[in-house]
């Protein structure tokens, strides 16, 4: 039994759980909440990957469909997202499998299109992503004008 309530102060609870583990007081651990927190770490990593990929794809859409507005800001965002995605996948190699998952790709594409529509007022983007994951992540590739 823990002395700090998970529901009222998760930071104090986490510190207490860490202390219990380090002091081998396993019988006092809040196993159910620890398991939830461990699962949430993985979900958080997946959300970050999807979010960064959606922002990258949205900017690639803007680059392709609004060539007259291309500028250093868009190019910088594209480069930053690619670099961040590359770093993130190196830090969490198991995330790489998401990149080839068609269901995940579809969800990311839908998010990217939503972002692009909000930022451009263009509503006739392709139904599915016209680019390969390799192109999207390539530091040397940008889509050509539509």
Role assignments for model-derived ranges:
Residues 1-146:
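Surface/interface-facing alpha-helical segments and adjacent flexible terminal/loop regions used
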């Amino acid at each position: 039994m823990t002395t700090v309530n998970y529901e009222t102060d998760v930071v104090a609870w986490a510190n207490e759980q860490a202390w219990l583990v380090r002091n081998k007081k396993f019988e006092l651990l809040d196993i159910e909440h620890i398991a939830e927190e461990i699962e949430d770490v993985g979900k958080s990593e997946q959300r970050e990957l999807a979010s960064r990929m959606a922002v990258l794809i949205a900017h690639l859409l803007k680059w392709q469909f609004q060539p007259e507005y291309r500028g250093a800001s868009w190019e910088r965002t594209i480069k930053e997202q690619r670099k961040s995605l590359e770093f993130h996948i190196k830090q969490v190699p198991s995330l790489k499998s998401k990149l080839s998952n068609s269901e995940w790709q579809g969800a990311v594409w839908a998010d990217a299109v939503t972002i692009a529509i909000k930022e451009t007022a263009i509503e006739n983007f392709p139904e599915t992503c016209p680019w390969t994951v390799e192109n999207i992540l390539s530091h040397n590739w940008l889509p050509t004008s539509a």
